[in-house]
């Protein structure tokens, strides 16, 4: 407001301002109807107060095309789509949902990718009308991922095998089915998809039962006929192996082929029937990677189980052993025996191992026949296995010479296994010399233990021992101790009268020295003075504690001045 020094002048201007404002109000309606023409000049203070800066005007009138992303500036589709639907399809949230719904689907061919880029239709339209789309494998709804839904082709292929069809003429299915573990019976070795046990499974079970009858009918039968079927299928490509073998006991047939022929009818159907290719395994019969009992062997009565995995040149008489082995493995199998039962020794081997802490060798093998008869319910199979082993198979354990020993004839000059005899009682010449020298095993046979002891004195008479230790005190006891130490690994009685310190047997059943003569390094030695022989009580007889050897060594060390 403009002020003036005089009040009269001030009132005059107020009247003029009011009259001008009232006249402008009256003319406002007329101005609005006409083209906009400012009646007030630009220098008017009202117009100057309502002006906007030029920067703001430029910002408001500038083009906003560069702000938008080029993906949102695509041309409109040919099909009429509402703008709301278009915005919903192209929003980032909708694109994210569409991407997540396509996870796990098979990749579409490039033509359908192009069509999905150009067309903005719904995904259902696209999946039904898109060209060259991959056929959906049993998945009807494309917008949702169902990983656990079963494909429709599986149902067709599993139900397509009727009871009259053979597996070799099965129609190949369109897709390769995934291998599933078999849940059916282990005898029906058919395709990888689990099937109901129809006529084909019954035929397989009949075949296997016939095999069991033929193999386990008689342990000493001259001929054993066996069948085995192995079937592996993938997408209708069936591979079948049918084996039909006849073995005569007179011929030298290898144990590997025979154990394959009859044991696989029960074990390989469950191992190979699942459709998986089984690798070479030491526990599989017929693949002699390592001489272990095969998987078809079961614990009771299988005396020949330890030899069924050996190659042919290890076994001199193949036929009778194989018949007895098959009879014992198939006839004496328990219902609850696992397929890995052959990985450990049979029950006869484990039951007759001596658990005495003084026992230093496998000296309980004379009880093998009794353990076989006790653990096997089929006495004929056990007797057949024992009679097959009568012909002589080497065992990898050293045996005690004073027990009943049955050894093979001395024909194992370059045998790769441990060349000591396997022991079975009731033989006319049960005592065999097991002495091993640089020329090989002695293997001489005697009818009584006295003759064997007299013969063993020829082995234990070391010529150089007296000369070596003659300069030391107590030379007689030292010589006998040295001779005993030389023969210790075979548990042979060396030279010396019964009851002398040099007489060293395996162990006494009830020896009097016991643990008291054990060598304790941090205690005072209770042994007698050096030079005196170690006393043996009369109750022990010809036996002597093996731990008294520690006393002899201690006596030797103290005599030489080492203590």
UniProtKB/Swiss-Prot annotation:
Gene Ontology biological-process annotations: embryonic camera-type eye morphogenesis; hindbrain development; negative regulation of DNA-templated transcription
Origin superkingdom: Eukaryota
Biased composition (Low complexity): 19-33, 112-122
Chain positions covered by the region annotation Disordered: 1-48, 101-226
Zinc finger (C2H2-type): 431-459
Keywords, comma-separated and alphabetical: Developmental protein, Metal-binding, Nucleus, Repressor, Transcription, Transcription regulation, Zinc, Zinc-finger
Keyword flag Zinc-finger: yes
GO cellular component: nucleus
Family per similarity comment: Belongs to the Elbow/Noc family.
Stated role: Required for segmental gene expression during hindbrain development. May function as a transcriptional repressor.
Subunit structure: Interacts with nlz1.
Record-given protein name: Zinc finger protein 503
């Amino acid at each position: 407001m403009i002020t003036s020094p005089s009040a009269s002048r001030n009132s005059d201007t107020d009247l003029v301002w009011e009259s001008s404002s009232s006249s402008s109000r009256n003319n406002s309606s007329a101005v609005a109807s006409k083209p906009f023409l400012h009646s007030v000049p630009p220098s008017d203070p009202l117009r100057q107060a309502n002006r906007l800066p030029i920067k703001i005007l430029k910002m408001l009138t500038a083009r906003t095309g560069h702000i938008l992303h080029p993906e949102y500036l695509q041309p409109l589709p040919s099909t009429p789509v509402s703008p709301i639907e278009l915005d919903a399809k192209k929003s980032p949230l909708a694109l994210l949902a569409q991407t997540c719904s396509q996870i796990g689907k098979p990749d579409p061919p490039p033509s359908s990718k192009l069509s999905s880029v150009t067309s903005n239709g719904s995904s259902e339209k696209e999946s039904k009308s898109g060209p060259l789309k991959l056929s959906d494998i049993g998945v009807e709804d494309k917008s949702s991922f169902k990983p656990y839904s079963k494909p429709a082709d599986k149902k067709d292929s599993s139900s397509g095998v009727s009871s009259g069809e053979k597996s070799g003429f099965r129609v190949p299915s369109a897709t390769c089915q995934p291998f599933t573990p078999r849940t059916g019976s282990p005898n029906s070795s058919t395709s990888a998809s689990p099937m109901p046990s129809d006529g084909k499974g019954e035929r397989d079970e009949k075949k296997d039962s016939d095999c069991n009858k033929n193999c386990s009918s008689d342990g000493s039968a001259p001929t054993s006929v066996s069948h085995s079927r192995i079937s592996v299928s993938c997408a209708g490509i069936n591979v079948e192996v049918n084996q039909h073998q006849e073995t005569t006991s007179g011929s030298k047939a290898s144990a590997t082929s025979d154990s394959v022929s009859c044991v696989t009818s029960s074990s390989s159907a469950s191992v190979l029937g699942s459709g998986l290719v089984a690798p070479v395994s030491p526990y599989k019969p017929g693949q002699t990677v390592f001489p272990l009992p095969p998987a078809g062997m079961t614990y009771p009565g299988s005396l020949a189980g330890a030899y069924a995995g050996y190659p042919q040149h290890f076994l001199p008489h193949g036929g009778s052993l194989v018949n007895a082995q098959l009879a014992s493995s198939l006839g004496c199998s328990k219902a609850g025996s696992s397929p890995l039962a052959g990985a450990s020794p049979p029950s006869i081997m484990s039951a007759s191992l001596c658990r005495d802490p003084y026992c230093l060798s496998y000296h309980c093998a004379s009880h093998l026949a009794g353990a076989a008869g006790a653990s096997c319910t089929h006495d004929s199979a056990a007797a057949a296995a024992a009679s097959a082993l009568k012909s002589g198979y080497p065992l990898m354990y050293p045996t005690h010479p004073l027990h009943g020993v049955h050894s093979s004839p001395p024909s194992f000059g370059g045998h790769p296994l441990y060349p000591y005899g396997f022991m079975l009682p009731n033989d006319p010449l049960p005592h065999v010399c097991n002495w091993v020298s640089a020329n090989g095993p002695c293997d001489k046979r005697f009818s009584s233990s006295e003759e064997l002891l007299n013969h063993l004195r020829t082995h234990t008479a070391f010529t150089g021992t007296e000369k070596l230790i003659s300069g030391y005190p107590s030379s007689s006891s030292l010589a006998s101790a040295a001779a005993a130490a030389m023969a210790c690994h075979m548990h042979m009685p060396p030279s010396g009268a019964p009851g002398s310190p040099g007489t060293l047997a395996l162990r006494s059943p009830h020896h009097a020295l016991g643990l008291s003569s054990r060598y304790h390094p941090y205690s005072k030695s209770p042994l007698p003075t050096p030079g005196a022989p170690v006393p043996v009580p009369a109750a022990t007889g010809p036996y002597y504690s093996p731990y008294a050897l520690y006393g002899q060594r201690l006596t030797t060390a103290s005599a030489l001045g080492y203590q």
